[in-house]
Regions:
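C-terminal/domain-terminus segments
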Residues: 70-104
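Flexible, glycine/small-residue-enriched loop-and-beta-strand segment within the central core
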Residues: 1-75, 102-103, 110-111
Length: 111
């Protein structure tokens, strides 16, 4: 319910994954430099806009992503992982852990 999947690249979701409401998964991002992001005017008056960059998101098996979590481009979430509600996942998460926060970080092992 109310999830957003921006799939300009691959989003691979493993078996038995549970994705709670309002989760956002992004595969696209823009340059941080303003000129690169907004484009450069050409001699003819037209604009050359930036190209969106993308990176895949991989979600392992037996993963639970809590409500309102945001998964950023290029992230891999391992198997048997719990991502806490409201987390912002900016880096890979290894197998068999519970992770949460902004930014998301491993808190403990998931046995």
């Amino acid at each position: 319910m109310n999830c957003t999947f921006l799939d300009d690249n691959i989003i691979r979701i493993g078996d038995n994954a549970l994705i709670a409401p309002n989760v956002q998964i992004y595969t696209a991002f823009h340059p941080t430099n303003a000129i690169d992001r907004f484009g450069v005017p050409k001699e003819d008056g037209s604009f050359e806009f930036c190209k969106t960059q993308t990176a895949p998101v991989i979600i392992g098996n037996n993963v639970w992503i809590g409500g309102g979590a945001i998964i950023m481009p290029g992230v891999t979430i391992g198997n048997n992982v719990v991502i806490g509600a409201g987390s912002v996942v900016t880096k890979d998460v290894p197998d068999n852990v519970i992770a949460y926060g902004n930014p998301c970080r491993v808190v403990r092992e998931n046995k």
